[in-house]
């Protein structure tokens, strides 16, 4: 069953729904973890433990999940989000303080960390040069979705 059309316009850079038809591409998930320090010589043998389907791993609610590209700028690098990263955004989640969200602010879409201080919401970047956006008490903050995963191509050629 195809995903219903979203009720709000998609922001520029949105690739579109993450779910159109149920597709499965299960790839081998190795039973060994990749060491990011010195490798263990005891792990000379490894096998396939399971199959990994990125749809199942990354998408909790297919009809409410969208892919979006992080725009230029480095305001979110402190949270591990770099320009050009692919963001997986779930519109069905209720945003909680600490979540990375896509919010509608001053007529545009922004990717920020949602925080609450003294009963008021703030949108924080992950860069010290960018001051938090303090949401005035008379303004309703519209959260378009919650960023649940990010992807970045490591090979630069």
Residue ranges and their predicted role:
Residues 41, 120-126:
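Short, solvent-exposed secondary-structure boundary/capping segments
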Residues 88-89, 102:
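Hydrophobic beta-strand signal
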Residues 84-85, 99:
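Structural motif
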Residues 1-77, 108-109, 116, 142-144, ...:
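Short, positionally conserved secondary-structure boundary motifs
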